[in-house]
Amino acid sequence: KPELGPQQLQMVMSSTGRNCLALGTAADANINTAADLRGKRLPWVIGSPALQTNVTAFLAYGGLTWDDVTKVEVGGFDEAWKAILNNQADAMTSFTSGGGTELDASPRGLHWLSTPHSETENWERMQAVAPHMAKRIATFGTNLSADNPLECGGFPYPILVTSPDRESDLVMNMAKGITEQFDSFVSAEPAAGGWATERQNFQWVLPYHAGAVAFWKSEGLWSDADEAHNQNLLNRQAVIAAAWEGLE
């Protein structure tokens, strides 16, 4: 077996911005709900499991699979959006802050598909495909603002991770240093606000390092529910690591 198996990475903190990963649709395709994707033309980016999974997750949200849509094979992310512009496809995933501007200015127009947080069963189907997707409200991106928000999902980026054997004091002071210096760098670029303490997600897909937990507890932000979630993730990592060691 390969020498490098599952790595027990642990979180320190992360940045959750005001954008989200959404499905951008051509406005003239009249896709108002995920169920409306049935029969539409969706890009399949050859050789990119990550991009394929993103689109698959939105199909799952609507209770659909690739059998319910027309698959349009494309060579990359940019080609997927060009296919929409050229009326060869109808929708593609993107961060709201980094895509959609050209489509919005085109005759087809842009419509971001909302994934309402109250639709619990839909979210369960989406997260079964893409467990890293977490609920959020986007106010940053093409056609989005505080007055025109989008109920959607996304994941923290960038994330600050470390190994379990890193000294707790070092990890704690790293989180403390970033938090204390937040006001000094928050205006450096639009996404920097995602490092704010109130934008941390303590129940994501990676467990937090003991030093980070100590810091967030000292800030009064770490709950019993966070602790239970963290222990489950740590146990999961231990099981996966043990299973790897047992492989021949």
Q: Where are the regions that the model predicts?
A:
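Extracytoplasmic
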Residues: P6-Q7, R18-C20, G39, P107-L110, ...
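Bilobed "Venus flytrap"/periplasmic-binding protein-like clamshell domains
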Residues: R18-N86, S97, F202-F215
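A structural signal for short loop-to-beta-strand junctions that line the ligand-binding cleft
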Residues: P2-T16, G141-E151
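Ligand-binding clefts/hinges and TM-proximal coupling segments of bilobed small-molecule sensing domains
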Residues: G47-A57, H132-Q200, W204-V205
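Pocket-lining segment of extracytoplasmic ligand-binding domains
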Residues: A29, W66-L170
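Structural motif
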Residues: L9-M11, A22, A91
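An extracytoplasmic/periplasmic, membrane-proximal ligand-sensing/linker region
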Residues: T96-W112, D169-N173, T179-E248
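Residue-level detector of short coil/turn "hinge" positions at structural boundaries
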Residues: P6, W66, A91, S223-D224
